[in-house]
Amino acid sequence: MSTETQDKPKAPTNPAQPEPVPPFPAQHQEKPGIESKLDPRPRYQAESYRPAGKLAGKAALVTGGDSGIGRAVAVLFAREGADVAIGYLPAERGDAEETRRAIESQGRQCLLIEGDLTQSKFCDAIVDKTVQKFGKLDILVSNAAHQNRKKSLEELTDEELEETFATNIFAYVRLARAALRCMKAGSSIIATSSVTGILGSKALPDYSATKGAINAFTKTLAQNVIDRGIRVNAVAPGPVWTPLNPADAGTSPEKVAKFGSDVPIGRPAQPEELAPAYVFLASNADSSYITGTVLQVMGGETAGG
C-alpha cells in the first residue's frame, strides 16, 4: 500500500448519516433526564471532526458532562488532548460512566465527580478535586442547567425559581470564583448560555432570565480577569437534542416530537454540532483574541429576527 493511500484521511461520515429531523417519537422523562433513554440517541461522537492536538496537556472541568452538550464537549476535549473531569447528579451515574468510557477510549484521563451544584460547597469541592487529580485546571465549562416550562409566571413556584437560578447562574459564579484561585494565564472559562438569553422565551421565564444573566456575567468577568491573561466566553445554542427538554414537566410528549422544528434550519442541533464551538473558545491557537463574547450557534435564529 502506498504512503499516499495510508495517509489519506477517512471521508466524513456525517453526509451519509443526515442529522435526525422532527417529528421524533413522543416521549417524556422524569428529571434530570437520562440520555440513554432518548429516542433517537443524541449524537456526540463528531465522527467527521479532525482533531489537531489543540488542547494537548490541558486539564478541563465540564459540569453536566454526563450527557447532552456537556458529554459532546468533554469527549471532543479529550480528542484534542485534554484530561477531563465531569460533574453530574446521582441519577445520571450511568450516563456519566458512558462519557468516561468515551474519554478514556481517546487515551485521556477522566474523573467523575458526583454532587449538587446548587450547593456552594460542592462548587468549591468539584474544582478542588479536579486540581487534586490533574494538578491544575486550564479550562472550566459551566454547562449544567435546569428549566421549568410554564404557561404563565403565576405557575412558577419559589422553589422552582430558586433551583433554576442556583443551578444556572449561581453555580457559574461560584465555579468561576473557585477556578480563578488556581487558574493561570492562558486559561479559559466557557459558559453555556441559550437563545432564550438573547431572544427570551415566554414559556421559560426563569430559565431565560438566568441565561441573560450568564451573558452579562460572562462579559463582566472577561473584563475583570483580562489583565490576568484568562479569557471568558459563552456559547448560546438554539434547540439541542438532549435530555433537558423531555425531562421538563411542562413539555408534553407531543411537543418533544416537534422539538426544534420551528427554527430556520428545521431541526434541533445534535450535541456534536455544538462541541467544536467550545474547542474553538478553549483553544488559544484559535481564539486568543476572543474574550467577553457570546457565540451564537442557533440554527439560523438571530436577534434581528
Model-derived features: where do they sit?
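Short C-terminal tail/terminal secondary-structure segment
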Residues: E4-D7, L38, A46-E47, K150, ...
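Conserved mid-core segment of classical short-chain dehydrogenase/reductases
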Residues: P23, Q119, D124, Q132, ...
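Active-site helix of classical SDR
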Residues: A176, T210, T218
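Alpha-helical segment proximal to the catalytic Tyr-Lys
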Residues: R181, Q223-D227
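Residue(s) in the substrate-gating loop at a strand-loop-helix junction
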Residues: S194
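A glycine/serine/threonine-rich, flexible loop-to-helix segment
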Residues: L204, D227, P239-V263, G304-G305
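A conserved structural motif in NAD(P)-dependent oxidoreductases
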Residues: V263-L274
